[in-house]
């Protein structure tokens, strides 16, 4: 079947080609079976062993090529070394420069250095076309004595054309002159070689310095330039050596030509140039601003406290007291100043609360705050009259009567009623506090007046103080009982905090262990702080009583001013030491609660990662976030604040 099909295919292809040729087309290619046969033969031969053999042969061929390449490089390097060696040998062969010159001129002495130098100079000039015919067949003398009468037919003419930087009168000496080649600038092409005598040049410069008149170079720029030009000689006289060593004195010519003069620097003028109206600039002169010294915050705070105390002392109408205990102002002035007294007391109470709640970092701050508190207590110690105490007690009774009448009329539960009740409660507390403080000041000031006048306290004043203390204690007990009864159960109408405390007490809201521990720590800290303040108050009370005893005993009357100051200093040191000991004992039970919080410049609390990024990394490297990140962060802060401002309900 296969053979018949192949014959039919071959016949069909041949017939097709015959038809295509008759039509004038290109016949089909019949050689398709040959590449298939070759491919089949190659596939048969390409076995695994043949591939390994071919790979080995390729590797051997590559290794041989590498070895041949290395050998070729070694041979090239050897040939290069030999070529360089032969080149060096070729260059070193032959005669040296000294041998060549000696052969050219056998008459020149090898030890004569001057003759050799002149020979070299002549040869270099001959190369440039400007040389002199040096034909020194005789010995070149080291010292030349120049005389015009010695010129003869057999004189050496090697110096013909050279110039001497001296006049004929200077050269006409019997003992002769030693001429040397003058130093010249190698960049100055116009300068020719000159012969000069060193001694004559030095003598000439010395004489010129003596003849020069002193001048002031900073007076004017033009004068300075004229004087500098006068210092430099513009003209010079020289002598030329002619044929057969004949001397020709040349006329004076300019030594420094303006066209050929070369300056290798900048002329600096120390004179301030005058600016005309057209040359004036719009720029202002730079002024150095001195930095002002900034005052520290502590100095400013101290100054503010002192100013407040001075203003209180100046504006207080009760500062001036007569010996009989009456004020120098009448009753109307006292009534007008009642508001001012209340404002002043509120300020003092606020300042005392700030001092009490202040945390002391070290002993220095503690001593400063105690001294400030002592000064404020001394400044606000004023005399309080019995009439004022009675008036304040009467006002307190009227307030209590008003509250009783309001409560008896009935109960009205609304926002206005709650607001008014809260105001009255605060007024009652402030009134009670002011009564207690005034009674304390009254007793203290009465003792002060008695000690100043030298009289003992009267029975009437003692009775008045006892009555006021009894009334104050009674009112305080009543206020405490009312406050305890009111604080037994929080009112729902007060605020959200009262509602939360009520729900917490009833057990509706459960408190977590962490919150309980935090609340317990806060309570322990508050108790510790209260004990600390109570101990300090008791110590101050003992100190005050001790001072009163010393004042009443008459101890200070026998002392001088200096002894009083020393005694007061010792007492202050003793009490300060005692306060420090009490503080140290109290700190044994102190357990600080440390809570580290990171806050950025916008007041936003940060986590540890953000704090490291913004507060440490950016500040250390001195760079911040980009514009896009900063705007995104600000938008997030604004959105967070907007969410917090939304109402709860």
Curated annotation (Swiss-Prot):
GO biological process: maturation of 5S rRNA; mRNA cis splicing, via spliceosome
Name of the molecule in the record: U4/U6.U5 tri-snRNP-associated protein snu66
Lineage top rank: taxon: Eukaryota
Basic residues: compositionally biased ranges: 286-303
GO cellular component: nucleus; spliceosomal complex; U4/U6 x U5 tri-snRNP complex
UniProt keyword annotations, A-Z: Coiled coil, mRNA processing, mRNA splicing, Nucleus, Ubl conjugation pathway
Chief location: nucleus
Biased composition (Polar residues): 43-56, 448-461
Family: Belongs to the SNU66/SART1 family.
InterPro entries: HIND (IPR045347), SNU66/SART1 (IPR005011)
Biological role: Required for efficient splicing of pre-mRNA.
Region span, Disordered: 27-61, 78-98, 129-154, 286-327, 433-464, 541-570
Sequence ranges of Basic and acidic residues compositional bias: 29-40
Any coiled-coil regions, as ranges: 49-93, 516-583
UniProt feature, compositional bias: Acidic residues: 307-317
